[in-house]
Amino acid sequence: MISSKASDYQQRIGYVFTDPSLLLQALRHRSAGTPHNERLEFLGDSVVNLLIAEALFQRWPRADEGALTRARSELVRETSLASIARTMQLGEQLILGPGELKSGGHRRDSILADAVEAVIAAIYLDADLATCRTVVLPWFETALTALPVGKPEKDPKTRLQEWLQARQWSLPVYELIFESGDPHTKHFRVSCTLGELKLRTEGEGSSRRLAEQDAASHAIDQLDSNK
């Protein structure tokens, strides 16, 4: 039986489930027991990549493969999916175990992004690909239209490196602060240090690479604010 809170949430995401248990599974983190959302996350990752690839292919008829790939990566990266989750207030709906609740798991990018993918898979399984496309693509519309046609924004590490190289300054140094979690729920915190600028930022993510991107993004924000 689905709760009234989850029932209301279906209206927010724009889809009412025939099988509400799929939504409940999509919202249940592995820390809260089974059935949890990891299998749905696996499927949802492929579905969202297909939907975004298809949308970009149709909207950018002159873009080459490289531009399309970079654009898709920008739209489906962890921070982008987590932003969608926050817009939909998905964190408030997550079913988490006591440990994740205590540590603020409902605010963590990796958990939010995984849940978005799981919800997408749940919609796909409950209906079909066409319905999933109709429901899900509007979630990405703002980000899709914001991308410069054929020239998606480079990732934060590349942008930061190019900014420093243009000024002939040393490249940033990334260091692992800590990692936690089991192999399926790893969490990383990384620092980014700019020696000449005496600037140090930190970032988090479900992989070291994502944590470094997050730290670089924070460094760019700091540099922009100091202009």
From Swiss-Prot:
Record function comment: Digests double-stranded RNA. Involved in the processing of primary rRNA transcript to yield the immediate precursors to the large and small rRNAs (23S and 16S). Processes some mRNAs, and tRNAs when they are encoded in the rRNA operon. Processes pre-crRNA and tracrRNA of type II CRISPR loci if present in the organism.
GO biological process, one term: regulation of gene expression
Protein name: Ribonuclease 3
Swiss-Prot/TrEMBL keywords: Cytoplasm, Endonuclease, Hydrolase, Magnesium, Metal-binding, mRNA processing, Nuclease, RNA-binding, rRNA processing, rRNA-binding, tRNA processing
Required co-factors: Mg(2+)
Cross-referenced SMART domains: DSRM, RIBOc
Class of this enzyme: hydrolase
Family membership: Belongs to the ribonuclease III family.
Subunit structure: Homodimer.
